[in-house]
């Protein structure tokens, strides 16, 4: 490493016709402006005596003069980052020929020292010299602040040397010294191909640190360069997480949509009718028959009628309202006033149960809250129906008021709700009261 720095320092001092210290090349890598400036300065003695003063003079030069000198001495392919990318992907024949001749001079024809890729003494120049330049160009394209991204040239050479030593150790352990000599060109091509992929992936990974400042210290560059598969591992981990989520998705069931209404009706009405059987002193057969009448459709009711007529008879005898349940289902009737399927927690009742609850409350046998707990009808609904039939509503509906004026108030409303003739009997009871 020291020999490489001394070689670069010797070429730099021979270009400027001065004897500077070998620690002088610790300037930035993109030294096109500072390199050309000492050519135009006349007091070279002050620069040779004081390196700090030489740096100040190099920084205070006139920029238009530096631009003209740089255009006359440099090639556009060496300064333009876009052209440099094209040169990296397809190295010219001259660079490959120089890689096999370490004794050849590393300066170009115009006297300006070349890139750090030309200072590889062991022939592996093109594969190891590309990364610092490519990384610097990639970060300049990604961030836009090229002045803060200039890597020190000595640091870039050190990084290249570390990468070279690690690659040599890994290849020497697998191939041996003879294999290392025979497969030199293959290592160059493979190393350059491996650097072509981390060039873009490394830029994507370094975009996260934009707010913290851009790459002033890149001591972690060899680690990130060798572990170029880190973004791929992160993407693979994300894909594995998505696969795990997709495999575990059948566990997340939509329970409210799957939940059946009849099951909740059975669990709730079982308690309600068992409580009613205890209060009214009825048998368990009557509670079971009430539940079956409320839940089962027409066909199953007919089969139950054929199977057990005794239970239905006992239920008819011990009915609280004195009115037997009809065998027809309210939802199955074509002339029903409620064609829509009932929804909600408290709408698991039909018009038959509602009529029975209304008649019981109007006859004074039960209160509204007691009928709510027994029949499963909401308190507000039951109270509204009772007040509507008694004519004690504060704001009665207009349509039903017209019907009340034309016909009897209770008879007309109950004929609308229950067209099977049972409403007339309950209406007569309410009139007598």
Swiss-Prot record:
It is found in: Nucleus. There is a cross-link at residues 254, 414 (Glycyl lysine isopeptide (Lys-Gly) (interchain with G-Cter in SUMO2)). One of its GO terms (molecular function) is ubiquitin-specific protease binding. It holds the Pfam family HTH_psq. Ubiquitous. Residues 340-392 form the HTH psq-type domain. A motif (Nuclear localization signal) lies at residues 339-345. Residues 1-51, 64-147, 299-348, 393-412 are annotated as: Disordered. The modification Phosphoserine is found at residues 42, 63, 249. GO terms for cellular component: nucleoplasm; nucleus. SUPFAM superfamilies: Homeodomain-like. One of its GO terms (biological process) is negative regulation of transcription by RNA polymerase II. Residues 13-34, 93-110, 316-329 have a biased composition (Polar residues). Residues 36-48 have a biased composition (Low complexity). Its main location: nucleus. May act as transcription activator that binds DNA elements with the sequence 5'-CCCTATCGATCGATCTCTACCT-3'. Repressor of ligand-dependent transcription activation by target nuclear receptors. Repressor of ligand-dependent transcription activation by ESR1, ESR2, NR3C1, PGR, RARA, RARB, RARG, RXRA and VDR. Interacts with ESR1 and ESR2 in the presence of estradiol. Interacts with CTBP1, HDAC3 and HDAC6. Component of a large corepressor complex that contains about 20 proteins, including CTBP1, CTBP2, HDAC1 and HDAC2. This is Ligand-dependent corepressor. The lineage of its organism: Eukaryota, Metazoa, Chordata, Craniata, Vertebrata.
């Amino acid at each position: 490493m020291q020999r490489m720095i001394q070689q670069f320092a010797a070429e730099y001092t021979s270009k400027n016709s001065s004897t500077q210290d070998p620690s002088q090349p610790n300037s930035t890598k993109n030294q096109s402006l500072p390199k050309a400036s000492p050519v135009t300065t006349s007091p070279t003695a002050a620069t040779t005596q004081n390196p700090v003063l030489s740096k100040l003079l190099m920084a205070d030069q006139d920029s238009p003069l530096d631009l003209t000198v740089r255009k006359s001495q440099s090639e556009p392919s060496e300064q333009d980052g876009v052209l440099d990318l094209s040169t990296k992907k397809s190295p010219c024949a001259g660079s490959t020929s120089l890689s096999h001749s370490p004794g050849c001079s590393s300066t170009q024809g115009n006297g300006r020292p070349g890139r750090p890729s030309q200072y590889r003494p062991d022939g592996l120049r093109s594969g190891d010299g590309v990364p610092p330049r490519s990384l610097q160009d990639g970060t300049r394209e990604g961030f836009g602040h090229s002045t803060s991204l200039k890597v020190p040239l000595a640091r870039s050479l050190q990084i290249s040397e570390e990468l070279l030593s690690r690659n040599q150790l890994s290849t020497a352990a697998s191939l041996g010294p003879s294999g290392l000599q025979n497969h030199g060109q293959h290592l160059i091509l493979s190393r350059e191909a491996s650097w072509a992929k981390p060039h873009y992936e490394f830029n994507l990974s370094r975009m996260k640190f934009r707010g913290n400042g851009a790459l002033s210290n890149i001591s972690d560059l060899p680690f990130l360069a060798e572990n170029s598969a880190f973004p791929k591992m992160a993407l693979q981990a994300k894909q594995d997480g998505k696969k795990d989520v997709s495999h575990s998705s059948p566990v997340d069931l939509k329970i409210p949509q799957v939940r059946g209404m009849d099951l909740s009706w059975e669990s709730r009405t079982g308690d309600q009718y068992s409580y009613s059987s205890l209060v009214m002193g009825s048998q368990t057969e009557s509670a079971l028959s009430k539940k079956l009448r409320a839940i089962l459709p027409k066909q199953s009711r007919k089969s139950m009628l054929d199977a057990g007529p005794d239970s239905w008879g006992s239920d008819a005898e011990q009915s609280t309202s004195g009115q037997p349940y009809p065998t027809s289902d309210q939802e199955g009737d074509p002339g029903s006033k409620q064609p829509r399927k009932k929804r909600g927690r408290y709408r698991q009742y039909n018009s038959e149960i509602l009529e029975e609850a209304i008649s019981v409350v109007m006859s004074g046998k039960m209160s509204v809250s007691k009928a709510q707990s027994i029949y499963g009808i909401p308190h507000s609904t039951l109270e509204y129906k009772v007040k509507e039939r008694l004519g004690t509503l504060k704001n009665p509906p207009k349509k039903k008021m017209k019907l009340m004026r034309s016909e009897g108030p209770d008879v007309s409303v109950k004929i609308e709700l229950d067209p099977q003739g049972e409403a007339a009997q309950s209406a007569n009871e309410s009139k007598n009261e």
